[in-house]
Design a protein with these regions (language model features):
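Short beta-strand-centered aromatic/proline hotspots
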Residues: 34-41
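Beta-strand secondary-structure signal
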Residues: 21-23, 37, 49
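SH3/SH3-like beta-barrel fold
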Residues: 48-54
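Short glycine-rich, low-complexity segments
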Residues: 1-33, 54-86
Length: 86
């Protein structure tokens, strides 16, 4: 998948159903989420904004499309392998 394809698919999710599930593994800033419900809050030319609920607080952060390309961020709805959360 190319960056352009990733941008188009994320834009489509944002327009149709922004409630998604993500896997994130980043060291800077330190974020680890597995099959975590999230909401796409914004889509911009080089980044997109996500919100997750953690410890009864909403955390908002921005990710680059490259993060999806290098698999630092996985949007489960893009891969088509939704797993039920335990």
């Amino acid at each position: 998948m190319t960056l352009t394809e990733i941008k188009i698919k994320i834009q489509k999710l944002y327009n149709t159903n922004p409630e998604i599930h993500i896997n994130v593994h980043c060291n800077h800033p330190k974020m680890y989420y597995d099959n975590e419900p999230a909401i796409i809050r914004g889509v911009y030319p080089h980044i997109f904004q996500l919100e997750v609920k953690e410890d009864n607080q909403i955390k908002s952060f921005y990710m680059q499309y490259e993060d999806v390309l290098i698999k630092r961020v996985e949007i489960i709805e893009l891969t088509g392998s939704i797993q039920p959360s335990i």
